[in-house]
């Protein structure tokens, strides 16, 4: 999803990310230079993603604001959607895998607990356990348009509507996923050299800013 959407974000829009999985997934891909991005990492928790998105969107009602977050972060802050000032320039991509997927992948220490991860760490099964109607009905009853996808084909079918530049209606686009697929995607990305390529690009950009002497100084500090 990040790969498909990142390069297609409308020029001049803004995008807010949930922490960890949402932010990391998009970090592997470039977004247009005119797009501003933000993430609520101050407290390093799930709180406040939707509230921050709403507040920013209120300041610039003529500008599109996108939000990308997982189900736990969404349900933690879902009361923000009921705010009477909720605008028509907000697009929310809700990645619903039914748990805190972050704790199940191989890079997280939590994965060593195996079958105990879901019930005791990843909060699996809460909030409707990937109900197909819970978020849909909540959004529609608040006057927010709803889209959903349970496959790549369905996601691509709804993607253009989600990215439309009309600022006369807001969307919640709920994509149902499986943690096993997300974890495999992460494993493939981190083992194909893409991460190394990204690090090299970052290194080159930093070098262009601080120069050779600056890079040498940074290397001495890191040693």
Language model features with spans:
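Active-site pocket-lining segments that scaffold enzyme catalytic pockets across diverse folds
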Residues: 1-22
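Thiamine diphosphate
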Residues: 28-223
């Amino acid at each position: 999803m990040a790969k498909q959407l990142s390069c297609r974000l409308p020029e001049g829009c803004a995008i807010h990310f949930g922490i960890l999985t949402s932010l990391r997934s998009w970090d592997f891909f470039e977004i247009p230079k005119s797009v501003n991005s933000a993430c609520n990492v101050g407290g390093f928790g799930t709180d406040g993603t939707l509230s921050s998105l709403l507040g920013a969107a209120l300041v610039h009602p003529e500008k599109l604001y996108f939000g990308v977050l997982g189900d736990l972060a969404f349900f933690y802050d879902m009361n923000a959607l009921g705010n009477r000032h909720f605008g028509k320039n907000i697009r929310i991509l809700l990645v619903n895998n039914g748990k805190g997927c972050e704790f199940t992948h191989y890079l997280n220490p939590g994965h060593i607990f195996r079958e105990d991860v879901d019930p005791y760490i990843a909060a699996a099964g809460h909030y409707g356990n990937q109900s197909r109607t819970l978020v849909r009905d909540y959004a529609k009853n608040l006057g927010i348009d709803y889209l959903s996808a349970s496959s790549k084909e369905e996601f691509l079918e709804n993607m253009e509507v989600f990215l439309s530049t009309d600022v006369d209606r807001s969307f919640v686009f709920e994509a149902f996923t499986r943690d096993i697929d997300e974890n495999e995607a992460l494993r493939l990305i981190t083992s194909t050299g893409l991460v190394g390529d990204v690090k090299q690009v970052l290194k080159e950009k930093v070098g262009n800013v601080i120069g050779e002497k600056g890079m040498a100084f940074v290397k001495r500090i890191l040693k």
